[in-house]
Amino acid sequence: MAAKIRKNDRVVVLTGKDKGKTGEVIEVLPKENRVKVRGVNLVKKHQRPTPTQQGGIVEIEAALHVSNVAHIDPKTSKPTRVGFKTLEDGRKVRVAKASGEIIDL
């Protein structure tokens, strides 16, 4: 199945404590159907010291389920669903369902 949300996409969180926040996808975990979004769903992690890094409590992004985020329409800047369309040259691209705007270039 083709990925509707990919790395570096702009998304908005639909549910949970960070509802309404927007951010950039920094990692996609396709086997778990999860994504990590920059600055969203921060959790505190107790980091053990290593020879190169100091220990302590650090905040990292935890993964969100892909159903809890929506792509931001490049034309209207509102949440939208994503579909696929084949262009004349044979390329398969993602399109915003709300405006019909092509997401991939």
Swiss-Prot record:
InterPro entries: KOW, Rib_uL2_dom2, Ribosomal_uL24, Ribosomal_uL24_CS, Ribosomal_uL24_KOW, Translation_prot_SH3-like_sf. One of its GO terms (cellular component) is ribosome. One of its GO terms (biological process) is translation. CDD domains: KOW_RPL26 (cd06089). Keywords: Ribonucleoprotein, Ribosomal protein, RNA-binding, rRNA-binding. SUPFAM superfamilies: Translation proteins SH3-like domain. The keyword rRNA-binding applies. GO terms for molecular function: rRNA binding; structural constituent of ribosome. Part of the 50S ribosomal subunit. One of two assembly initiator proteins, it binds directly to the 5'-end of the 23S rRNA, where it nucleates assembly of the 50S subunit. One of the proteins that surrounds the polypeptide exit tunnel on the outside of the subunit. This is Large ribosomal subunit protein uL24. It comes from Rhodospirillum centenum (strain ATCC 51521 / SW). The lineage of its organism: Bacteria, Pseudomonadati, Pseudomonadota, Alphaproteobacteria, Rhodospirillales. The gene is rplX.
